[in-house]
């Protein structure tokens, strides 16, 4: 009896143990990452030929304690290598693990290699050559703490390499894991199997090989036992011949069918090639088709299983499309696949919850470094009057109502950017803004008392409903999380895409950036204030302080201002403002852009202006500003400096976003100024519910 070890992916150990026992293995013992077992020579070859789950089959040769590199050398040399392989064979060493002595795996591999070579040369035998790419013998050494385990890798290449997939192709899951996913899916051979996101077809090919009794090792060309002196070629040929007979019989007798589709024509072509090389190409129909086009290939029966490994994202900006994808798949399953089973393998349980289905079973497994889950569902048969419920239905209804109200209004006003929803329902705490054919969803960060998983799931429901109600492509939705911003954090950079979208606002053309910053470059609540500035600016010298991207300057310029001066501390936003001005034909000396600390510039400037717009931050303590600024505390000082620059008969439009702001009217009067609040006049329909989003004043000489 041979003592052997089969390695596998984490989470598949018990499944592998059952498989090995079915092959005839005895004394199976599960450990993390594999199974120890025993068997005769025939079982050695059968496990290599038939195991769908094992990554490698190892023949343990011994262990040694490693307190120095000499201990490792002597421990390896103690094995009778000349009985393991002939000097004419090539070999390679795979070394894993480190300790205080062996701190580099390459160094460990070199010491093992030296010990094996010296074992031959000391017996005056020819020195065996190292071949890292295609060796006849692979030696595996695993160092754990002070113990090195030495084994012969009888697999050669990993057993996931079945021989049907081009090694250059990218596979999101290995064939061994794919086989486990098939086994755990609840699918029964003889019933239909469909993968709507099949990629290169690995799940379907593994299922078809399982269903037709085709051994996973049948198409492999190289094995790790070819240079092993104890290799029994006669028994191996018997095992191989039996596998070939069973494969022919299984294929001839199999009557059901497999269906695969993917939106990428290139991977579908690769899938067809892989299936043909695996010997089961005639059983699988592959189509180039998006999930949105998915239909039941057997509407009259029999029932089958939908099995897939859908994509998942690690970045926030990829989630809207994936949320929409999973929500869509859930709706299609309910509408078209009643009575079928569904099994999905994913690294994102949150995305799976977008299906709006209840899982019957779930399994955990590792896909490389990723913790993954496989969930199995049974889709209830639909009745004629059954109607699938939409996620976040209350939110969807409100958004639909708002869309009907605002879409026509915006078209009549001549604006492309407006707010569709602003936390209208407390439990759906987001803002939804439309920018032409794009949508930005801003999630207001939930309080810490709210369960994070529930909050994330609600956000996913909101995104799915938004895409459905507005009928937009998922890649046209941008998701952001918004917290209360202070000072410089309000302009925090989020990305580096540099993608700008041209939008119209009345007669102005403006650039917005929906992804790189928390704000987009256009404050929608100030839309009417900007229009008023345009109407007030004809023939006047206009000053825009804390200008941001200069959209107010654009309106003033288009309104006929004699000159415009735009001041902001940020070079990025001034360059943006320059682009906005250029887009509207506002160039030349009449339109100045100044990079400066606005408060310092205001104190030192000695020019005169007819119309001044200032929209300062509520609070700022930027390192580049000389002093901390508080709009409630400091607005009179601000007005005193502004008055000095205001030409006789001129007007200041002053706006800020501080809730509960109180204008010091008595203090203004002492400065010889008076204020008229125009907040309500500057709030458009889409911000009517949020009357404290800003306050706005016209200030003139008393």
From Swiss-Prot:
Query: What would you give as a GO molecular function for this chain, any one?
Result: 23S rRNA (guanine(2445)-N(2))-methyltransferase activity
User: Where would you find this protein in the cell?
Assistant: Cytoplasm
Q: Which InterPro entries has this protein been placed in? A: 23SrRNA_methyltr_KL (IPR017244), DNA_methylase_N6_adenine_CS (IPR002052), RlmKL-like_Mtase (IPR000241), RlmKL-like_Mtase_CS (IPR053943), RlmL_1st (IPR054170), SAM-dep_methyl-trfase (IPR019614), SAM-dependent_MTases_sf (IPR029063), THUMP_dom (IPR004114)
EC number(s) given by UniProt:
2.1.1.173, 2.1.1.264
Q: In the UniProt record, does the keyword Translocase occur? A: no
Q: Which Pfam families match?
A: Methyltrans_SAM, RlmL_1st, THUMP, UPF0020
Q: Which cysteines are joined by disulfide bonds?
A: none
Annotated Gene Ontology cellular component terms: cytoplasm
Q: Which reaction does it catalyse?
A: guanosine(2445) in 23S rRNA + S-adenosyl-L-methionine = N(2)-methylguanosine(2445) in 23S rRNA + S-adenosyl-L-homocysteine + H(+); guanosine(2069) in 23S rRNA + S-adenosyl-L-methionine = N(2)-methylguanosine(2069) in 23S rRNA + S-adenosyl-L-homocysteine + H(+)
Q: What does this protein do?
A: Specifically methylates the guanine in position 2445 (m2G2445) and the guanine in position 2069 (m7G2069) of 23S rRNA.
Similarity section: Belongs to the methyltransferase superfamily. RlmKL family.
Read off the PANTHER family from this record.
Answer: RIBOSOMAL RNA LARGE SUBUNIT METHYLTRANSFERASE K/L (PTHR47313), RIBOSOMAL RNA LARGE SUBUNIT METHYLTRANSFERASE K_L (PTHR47313:SF1)
Question: Any idea what this protein is called?
Answer: Ribosomal RNA large subunit methyltransferase K/L
* Organism (species): Escherichia coli O6:K15:H31 (strain 536 / UPEC)
Show the taxonomic lineage: Bacteria, Pseudomonadati, Pseudomonadota, Gammaproteobacteria, Enterobacterales
